[in-house]
């Protein structure tokens, strides 16, 4: 009788322990799912751009990339010493430290030197760095967060991503008006042979040498917008675009 009672107790405590372990595993699984779901927040992305006389367009540029969840924008100010400043036009973004201005006012314009500086200083802090001009906007199909794009499995082995330009026409406009660029120039120049573009580069890569504004480091292996490794010279004959 006593032995039978002990067996029942052991069975009861075993089931109780098993239920606790099962509950713990469920909690851990939910935590893992939550972390994976919010993994985008761990990816850090910045934009590096060199600017001169762009005050009419710079705010739209900044807010476009902010809407795409870019974490930081580094603006290399290459305006004339007494030229326009960003104090008013970007006041809120400067105040929040979303935009950082680097003073190159009145200095000789060497865009690649500034790109090199931006990469060397920030490669340890950002997973991806975007080197685009103020008139260059990334537009992704069905995505509003660039981190969702960069986290796609197709880019896991890519050190850099080359995205083709989509050129817009002048829309028969002769004079400036206060509408945004997107509102003023919706029509696209449909040239299927056009394949120029710009590069997004992965951070924390040693030995990067900025040699061209389009490819950045010529020797670096690059992917297209579909994650396929490609040769730039071949792509001149065969357009690759997202």
For every predicted segment, state its role.
Residues 63-72:
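Short, acidic, metal-binding catalytic loop of nucleotide-sugar glycosyltransferases
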Residues 126-139:
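Short beta-strand-to-loop acidic/aromatic patch adjacent to the donor-nucleotide binding site
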Residues 71-80, 103-105:
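Short beta-strand/loop segment that forms part of the nucleotide-sugar
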Residues 86-128:
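Active-site-proximal specificity loops/subdomain of glycosyltransferases
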Residues 49-63, 79:
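Active-site beta-to-alpha loop of glycosyltransferases that engages the nucleotide-sugar donor
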Residues 111-116, 140-242:
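Catalytic-site signature of metal-activated, phosphate-bearing donor transferases
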Residues 8-37:
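N-terminal signal-anchor transmembrane helix specifying type II single-pass membrane topology
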Residues 44-46:
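Cell-envelope/extracellular polymer assembly enzymes that use nucleotide-activated donors
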């Amino acid at each position: 009788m006593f032995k039978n009672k002990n067996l029942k107790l052991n069975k009861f405590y075993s089931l109780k322990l098993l239920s606790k372990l099962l509950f713990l595993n469920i909690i851990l699984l939910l935590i893992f799912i939550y972390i994976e779901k919010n993994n985008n927040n761990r990816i850090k992305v910045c934009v590096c751009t060199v600017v001169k006389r762009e005050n009419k367009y710079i705010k739209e540029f900044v807010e476009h990339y902010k809407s795409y969840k870019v974490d930081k924008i580094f603006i290399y100010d290459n305006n004339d010493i007494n030229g326009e400043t960003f104090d008013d036009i970007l006041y809120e973004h400067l105040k929040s430290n979303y935009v950082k201005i680097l003073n190159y006012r009145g200095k000789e314009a060497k865009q690649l030197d500034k790109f090199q500086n931006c990469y060397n200083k920030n490669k340890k802090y950002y997973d991806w760095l975007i080197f685009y001009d103020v008139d260059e906007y990334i537009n992704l199909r069905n995505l509003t967060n660039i981190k969702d794009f960069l986290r796609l499995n197709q880019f896991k082995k890519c050190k850099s991503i080359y995205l083709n330009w989509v050129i817009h026409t002048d829309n028969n406009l002769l004079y400036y008006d206060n509408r945004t660029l997107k509102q003023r120039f919706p029509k696209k120049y449909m040239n299927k042979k056009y394949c120029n573009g710009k590069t997004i580069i992965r951070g924390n890569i040693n030995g990067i040498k900025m040699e061209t504004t389009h490819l950045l480091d010529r020797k670096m292996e690059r992917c297209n917008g579909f994650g396929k490794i490609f040769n730039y010279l071949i792509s001149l004959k065969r357009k690759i675009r997202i």
